[in-house]
């Protein structure tokens, strides 16, 4: 570059490297011959050069005063067939070193070991490789070589059938317990998994909502607001293998096509199709009339009403509040028992049966093995398996079933179940004892006593009296006066009536006929101890068959 001073003379000159057309076209240094490059250089017409020379201004400064810009020539790629291009390409030696970039002008792919990246070998024992990994996989099950296949099958059958544990979960529990079947089955027995059970109405409502909203679970939850989003998604993937939801989508398309063919004009105004739902208050595109409620509702509210018969709740808070209002409270007579709920719901140990055993000193006649202590579990009935207590020895599963019928498992007994069974046994024993005492009573003697009491009552209550016997009673209007003195016969009769009727003074006065209820009551107060002693003696005589025979002989002699 030339520099000029104030007088216009050249003060210093530098040489500036100006790239020429050949250097621009050549590009990166490669082993490609120059003949190939010259074929791609466009031809410049001479007329264009003459026009440029004619447009040069005479008064313009010298060329040395202007910076020369590198001339850019446009490349013109010639289109040729694949055969011509392959013929024109020069042969490149495979061993020659390529000095240009990997992607050269010929668009060749460099293949070979020298073009590959060098990656160090993976060392599995290096802890630095696994320190920053949070998504490490965990081994659930790997069948060992020394495990007993029969015990393994028995463990899987017991875990899945009896405790309703998934097989993969049971195998994982066995793995973390170092393949110890006893400790693994003990841990499985402590696990109680609560399953989310869906009713038929909820399943139908979910299927209808799936036709409308597809896999938009948040919209489906608006119809099943008492269900959480996690529960809905879990139910979808659990039932996905059993129910092909693609059929619901196809049926939706078929219904839409058929509805277009048989479309009938709606009698309702078009304004309701753009209004808000009267139930949930949300705006929907396709509003429908609920004929039962006589109001426009969205499709979700209408489906819920058709399936359940009640309006769809608009929020989970209202549903929970309604459940709390309708919740059945514990009765007052059961609150005392609910204080010991944890104690009664504990696993049975057989201590209740141990307490009710009558020892030898309390027995009149002691017989061995009459009242054995049953186990703390349900007894077998056909193919019903017995669930023994933790202290008892566990039996093999194969010995409980003969293969001809299903193996039914029952839950272990609780303390409450033992208490109920003890009460049932005691009530049956009391009923048997009452039947035995009833068989000792002479039914004919009791019937004769009742007959005598009936005759006495009839004699007192009869309205016809002989004038020769009671003339003063018929013709006198004065009140009948009863004597205050008690004869020996009246005393024996009233004590006997107290044994039969208890403290019913009016009935006793009617049976005796010569005393009023007040007189009988006064006699009871004066002789209460003697009446109670006679009552106890009467009950003892009723229980003693020998005494009953003596009483019959005394009555016969009388």
From Swiss-Prot:
Residues 107-192 form the ELM2 domain. The keyword Transcription regulation applies. One of its GO terms (biological process) is negative regulation of DNA-templated transcription. One of its GO terms (molecular function) is zinc ion binding. Residues 378-402 have a biased composition (Polar residues). Keywords: DNA-binding, Metal-binding, Nucleus, Repeat, Repressor, Transcription, Transcription regulation, Zinc, Zinc-finger. Residues 193-244, 481-532 form the SANT domain. Gene3D superfamilies: 1.20.58.1880, 4.10.1240.50, Homeodomain-like. Residues 36-56 have a biased composition (Acidic residues). It is found in: Nucleus. Its main location: nucleus. Residues 1-106, 378-406 are annotated as: Disordered. Residues 69-80 have a biased composition (Basic residues). A zinc finger (GATA-type) spans 271-325. One of its GO terms (cellular component) is transcription regulator complex. It comes from the Eukaryota. Disruption phenotype: Loss of function results in a suppression of sel-12 mutant phenotypes, possibly by up-regulating hop-1 expression. Double knockout with lin-35 results in defects in growth, vulval morphogenesis, somatic gonad development and fertility. CDD domains: SANT (cd00167). Belongs to the CoREST family. Probable corepressor protein, which probably participates in the transcriptional repression of the presenilin protein hop-1. Probably acts via the formation of a multiprotein complex that deacetylates and demethylates specific sites on histones. Acts redundantly with the transcriptional repressor lin-35 to play a role in vulval morphogenesis and promote germline proliferation. PANTHER family: REST COREPRESSOR, REST COREPRESSOR COREST PROTEIN-RELATED. Probably part of a large repressor complex. Interacts with histone demethylase spr-5/lsd-1. This is REST corepressor spr-1. It comes from Caenorhabditis elegans.
């Amino acid at each position: 570059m030339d520099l000029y001073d104030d007088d216009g003379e050249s003060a210093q000159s530098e040489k500036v490297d100006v790239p020429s057309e050949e250097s621009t076209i050549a590009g990166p240094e490669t082993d490609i011959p120059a003949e190939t490059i010259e074929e791609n250089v466009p031809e410049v017409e001479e007329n264009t050069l003459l026009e440029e020379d004619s447009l040069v201004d005479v008064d313009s400064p010298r060329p040395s005063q202007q910076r020369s810009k590198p001339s850019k020539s446009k490349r013109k790629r010639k289109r040729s067939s694949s055969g011509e291009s392959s013929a024109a390409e020069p042969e490149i030696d495979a061993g020659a070193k390529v000095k240009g970039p990997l992607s050269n002008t010929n668009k060749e792919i460099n293949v070979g070991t020298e073009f590959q990246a060098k990656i160090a070998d993976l060392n599995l024992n290096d802890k630095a490789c696994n320190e920053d990994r949070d998504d490490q996989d965990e081994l659930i099950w790997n069948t060992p070589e020394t495990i007993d296949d029969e015990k393994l099958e028995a463990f899987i059958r017991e875990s899945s059938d009896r405790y309703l544990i998934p097989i993969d979960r049971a195998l994982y529990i066995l793995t973390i317990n170092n393949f110890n079947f006893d400790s693994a089955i003990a841990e499985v027995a402590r696990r109680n998994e609560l399953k989310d059970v869906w009713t038929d109405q909820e399943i139908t409502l979910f299927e209808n909502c799936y036709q409308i909203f597809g896999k938009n679970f948040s919209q489906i939850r608006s119809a099943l607001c008492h269900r959480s989003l996690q529960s809905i998604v879990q139910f979808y993937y659990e039932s996905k293998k059993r129910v092909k939801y693609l059929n619901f989508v196809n049926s939706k398309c078929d219904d839409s096509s058929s509805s277009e063919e048989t479309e009938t004009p709606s009698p309702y105004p078009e304004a309701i199709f753009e209004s808000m739902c009267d139930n949930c208050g949300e705006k929907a595109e396709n509003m429908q009339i609920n004929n039962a409620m006589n109001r426009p509702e969205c499709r979700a509210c209408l489906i819920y009403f058709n399936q359940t018969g009640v309006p769809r709740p608009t929020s989970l808070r209202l549903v929970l509040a309604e459940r709390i209002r309708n919740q059945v409270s514990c009765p007052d007579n059961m609150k005392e028992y609910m204080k010991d709920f944890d104690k009664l719901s504990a696993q049975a140990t057989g201590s209740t049966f141990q307490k009710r055993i009558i020892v030898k000193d309390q027995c009149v006649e002691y017989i061995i093995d009459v009242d054995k202590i049953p186990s703390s579990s349900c007894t077998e009935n056909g193919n019903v398996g017995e669930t023994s207590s933790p202290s008892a020895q566990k039996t093999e599963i194969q010995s409980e079933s003969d293969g001809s019928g299903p193996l039914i498992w029952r839950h272990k007994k609780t303390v409450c179940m033992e208490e109920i069974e003890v009460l049932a046994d005691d009530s049956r024993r009391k009923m048997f004892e009452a039947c035995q005492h009833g068989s000792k009573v002479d039914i004919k003697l009791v019937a004769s006593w009742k007959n005598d009491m009936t005759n006495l009552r009839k004699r007192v209550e009869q309205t016809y009296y002989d004038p020769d016997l009671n003339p003063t009673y018929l013709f006198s209007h004065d009140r009948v006066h009863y004597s205050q003195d008690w004869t020996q016969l009246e005393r024996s009769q009233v004590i006997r009536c107290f044994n039969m009727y208890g403290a019913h003074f009016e009935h006793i006065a009617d049976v005796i006929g010569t005393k009023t209820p007040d007189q009988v009551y006064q006699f009871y107060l004066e002789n209460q101890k003697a009446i109670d002693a006679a009552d106890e003696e009467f009950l003892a005589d009723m229980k003693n068959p020998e005494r009953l025979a003596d009483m019959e002989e005394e009555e016969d002699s009388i």
